[in-house]
From Swiss-Prot:
Database matches in InterPro entries: Ribosomal_uS11, Ribosomal_uS11_CS, Ribosomal_uS11_sf
Family, similarity comment: Belongs to the universal ribosomal protein uS11 family.
Keyword DNA repair belongs to the record: no
Species annotation: Bombyx mori
Listed name of the protein: Small ribosomal subunit protein uS11
Molecular function per GO: structural constituent of ribosome
Chain intervals with Basic residues compositional bias: 142-151
Keywords: Ribonucleoprotein, Ribosomal protein
CC annotations in GO: ribonucleoprotein complex; ribosome
Chain intervals for the UniProt region annotation (Disordered): 131-151
């Protein structure tokens, strides 16, 4: 029988989530707020937009379908996202606000303003606020047919 080999102790690698930073340093993330009239998404990524840090919707916070787009649901979603960001070390956010856009409405839903205010009140520093609603240069045909929506 061959002699037994001694097991080599493996070094444990410490894995940390979130960006590497110094204590007290402001670390930026990007909060993508998509506010339609049916729901509100608050999605925080790193600066490149590739790595998702937290994503919460208004529908995840309330039970009734009619309340998904409400300002209250958006506020709860934004507070939840801010809490997750703080645990991962993100202290400041750039805001990208988006409405449905395209050939539909270009105005953000009711949850947009309350989500932004909730992020600001939860001691997150706000960097730049930008509207990224897709606006067509020449739109496709709207829904409703030749004679339009008849009430």
């Amino acid at each position: 029988m061959a002699p037994r080999k001694n097991k080599v102790a493996k070094e444990e690698v410490q894995v940390t989530l979130g960006p590497q930073h110094l204590v007290g340093e402001t670390v930026f993330g990007v909060a993508h707020i998509f506010a339609s009239f049916n729901d509100t998404f608050v999605h925080v990524t790193d600066l490149s937009g590739r790595e998702t840090i937290a994503r919460v919707t208004g529908g995840m916070k309330v039970k009734a379908d009619r309340d998904e787009a409400s300002p209250y649901a958006a506020m709860l979603a934004a507070q939840d996202v801010a809490e997750k960001c703080k645990t991962l070390g993100i202290t400041a956010l750039h805001i990208k606000l988006r409405a449905t856009g395209g050939n539909k409405t270009k105005t953000p839903g009711p949850g947009a303003q309350s989500a932004l205010r909730a992020l600001a009140r939860s001691s997150m520093k706000i960097g730049r606020i930008e509207d990224v609603t897709p606006v067509p240069s020449d739109s496709t045909r709207r829904k409703g047919g030749r004679r339009g929506r008849r009430l």
